[in-house]
Amino acid sequence: MEYYDTDSEDEDEPCSPTVTSVFSANNRLSCSSLKNEKTPLTTVFTKKWLVKSIPMPSDYKRGIYAEDGPYDEVTYVLSGSNFTFTEKSAYVLDIDGLVTFTNLKHKVVRNKRKTIRRAITYVPGDVLMRKHKSIVRVLTCDGVLFIKGLSFASDAALWHVLCSFLNDRPNPHYLCYCTFKTFANILLTLEYRCRVNRALILVNKLLAVGYYLVGNFNYVSPQCSLLGYLGDVLTAQVVAWSRLSQIAITSDSRKIREAFTCMKHLLTVSWLTHERTDLSSDSIYKTLLAHEHIIAGIFCKCDTCRPPPAAINHNTALRVKNWHENNKNRLATDPNLQFRTRWNIEVNGGPELPRLFHSINFPTMYRGILRDRYLRQFYKFQNMVRFHVLTHTCSLQADELLFFQWWNEFMFMYFLRLYLSKCVKSDYTQAVNMFTYYLKAFRLVVCDIARGKCVNPSISELCEKVAHIVDHLVEDTSMASLLREICNFNRIIRDPKHAWIFPHYLRDDTGLQGKVLLEHILRDKFLSLRLDDPLLEHVGLLRSKILNESVKITFNEFTLRQLERSMWLENLLENHRSRLY
């Protein structure tokens, strides 16, 4: 962007847009009054192209988006009428991605008491009409990326999180939602702006399927569309990072503060700009694994989480106390982090380094990566030590366990992005195939259950609905249709009349998809598993027992605090309705 200074009488100050929060600690939009007009707390956005270009990390490196601080007063001249924002965080904004404000005036006015930083710009009348002042108000103070079709302020919150993350300033004060229309427009906007790698766009299209298949957000009710399986990979990672930062900020735990400090030293936006296709040679991924090992050592001092130096390497032991001094710049090249060495747990009785990944339904995706020896070894390793940290940290506080859970989410999102980058080349045909395979396997499981003791009349209806979804999925299915079928499947599963399928102790977040199907495919893929091996108890009951009995919180509270999300959205909608009527 280019800004020209046309005011020679006053002292000039540089101007650049940036991203700040419009949410206060109580999850309300912070608004100030306009001249002769009151700004609503919740803004309803019209179906109009209001595209602010995404500040990609490469732009930061060039210094284009250097932060100069806010203006005390920003005046927008729109169709002959002026409206001024006078607040400490009033940032000048490029409203449209195609129209750059080249008529910006900025000056500093000094009097005896204070210094006022002012900015004046002219908004083209064909870009924004006078009645859309509230849109400019939110855009100006937030620097949010807006796209065609946005309907509620929660969508603005979603994009603020994304832009905040790109600015390396994640905002933990609110939760966000994403609708079908918003997700479709995300893809349109990314392609329209041409600011990201085209291959990355295709990877983002696949996340909705991949995230759903592994069973992370299956507990979302049909009434609320959550960004987990409808959003893109960047947003999913932002949410995990936001929750981590929120827990770290609000917690009194010294361990959490120490772990979060370690993470901030490593996690930057640089990895967003790289297209990665080979997991075995990805230095950032291996660095994340090293960080994970360090965080495990902070919370747990057992030999698995914090092995003795001799058990890893006599010369370059990774210990928490000397991490800053000895490993600040060498984590990615540490000999302990060589890929083959790290994942090979069968050589010389090496120590089982901790794996804190999310409890994913990995056999669902296992067929597609069977030929990859690295990932095959990864899954074997993960399955062996998945519950190590939870079983060793039952004495931790609830927020410390939450911290672990959201670190797992962040790591899992990064791994999923690497995997999709490797598999996807030019389209999302593989996504359709994966989901079709998933549905067919699910239908087989349901039929097997129907032959058992718990026969129920609803089983035939359930099979028919699943078959109907399978018939609609073809290789040229559009992404929008694919997402609709995914949500349709989720609604079918959550129908109360199908609750008889669920054993009582398996009714947690992943439900039937994440438990019954898990055991079915586990035994199908791993013939060496004994029939009396209690897989489901190990995957579901053990984890729920640890959380519910030792920490005294429900599993849904442990994962995402869904109730908190729902209440926040209801408050926004209620504010909106009260202003309409």
From Swiss-Prot:
Domain of life: Viruses
Protein's name in the database: Protein ORF B
Organism (species): Elephantid herpesvirus 1 (isolate Asian elephant/Berlin/Kiba/1998)
Lineage start: Viruses, Duplodnaviria, Heunggongvirae, Peploviricota, Herviviricetes
